Regions:
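Extended, low-polarity transmembrane helix blocks
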Residues: 1-40, 58-160
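Perimembrane loop-to-helix junctions flanking transmembrane segments
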Residues: 45-56
Length: 160
């Protein structure tokens, strides 16, 4: 028996758990981030949105909090609901993607500027030393990017 077959034999009983690990991590993270914004509207977030000139900051901040809790719960519950849960999981994954794109745009847009500038400017010297740029490190290693891509995974895959 080669090592690959041996590892397959060990992992086989746990293969059904793999998506649940991702589902529970993403769902719990979103639920906790959303609950942390209660009671509604979240005052600190409203003040921050006002400072950025966002229209109806109380409504937007409340929708973000409710969206986080709802998407997190739907990611988890969608896996338990069989075929009807497939659609719920995909919609929740899409909601996670939308929320995370908004979070990255509003709170972390400087990461993109740092990350993309060398490519846009065509500065080969800077491109070869990207790891020295703070935005590059945040962009690649951030929790936000992992949450975004986990949401994308569930939006594409659903319960399949």
């Amino acid at each position: 028996m080669n090592i690959s077959n041996y590892l397959d034999a060990i992992a086989k009983p746990f293969q059904g758990l793999a998506p649940w690990i991702l589902r529970l991590v993403l769902g719990t993270s979103f639920i906790l981030h959303g609950i942390g914004k209660f009671p509604l509207p979240p005052e600190g977030m409203v003040i921050w949105f006002e400072s950025m000139g966002i229209f109806a900051p109380e409504i937007v901040a409340s929708m973000v909090a409710l969206g986080e809790v709802g998407a997190g719960a739907a990611i988890i519950l969608g896996g338990a609901l069989g075929s009807s849960g497939h659609l719920i999981t995909r919609l929740a994954g899409g909601a996670v993607v939308v929320i995370m794109i908004g979070a990255l745009y509003l709170a972390h847009s400087s990461w993109f500027a740092d990350f993309l500038t060398p490519f846009v400017d065509g500065d080969i010297e800077v491109c070869s030393n990207l790891k020295s740029r703070p935005g590059y490190m945040h962009f690649i290693y951030s929790e936000q990017m992992y949450l975004l891509f986990l949401g994308l995974y569930f939006a594409i895959k659903g319960n399949n």
